[in-house]
Amino acid sequence: MFNLFKKKQIPSINHQHKNLLISLPLNWKYEFEEGDQEACFDPKSQSTLRLNVIKVTPPEGKTPEENIKDLTVNQPYVTTSKGYLLTKPAYRESLEDGNNITLVTWKLINYDGDEKTIAVLSYTVLSEEKDSEQEKEIFNLLENSLQNSELLN
């Protein structure tokens, strides 16, 4: 017997932006923006995910713990299934073009080697829509995708 109440998963594909390989919704569109950043969005929604990948070299003389604190900006983090550091989402409310928006930001950090790769993902959603069923599904997909994403060399 099948479950009539089982939620249908959002169809997704693997998407690569620079060194970041992440699973995102199949129907999303992609645009490059200024500063080597990429915007990803559902054409039927006003929400946007921005991807930015940077490489940094921590200063010499700091302990690994101090470097992690600097890279995560002292945010709580977890270690993903691939061994990367993933900061917990940081929320910021703002006003943009007369609309209340919520900006949710994650950092995915490859801590191996001398040069560290950091993927910064920022999801912008209208504050009035952030608790909608659709946005909750997208948010869960992003969280799960980040847990399984890769930062390629």
Walk through the language-model features, giving the residues of each.
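Surface-exposed amphipathic alpha-helical segments
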Residues: 28, 120-153
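Glycine-rich, often proline-containing surface loops adjacent to acidic residues and nearby aromatics
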Residues: 47-50, 87-88, 117-123
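Secretory pathway targeting signatures of secreted, lumenal, and periplasmic proteins
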Residues: 4, 12-70, 94-95
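A general structural signal for short secondary-structure boundary/capping elements
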Residues: 55-58, 72-77, 153
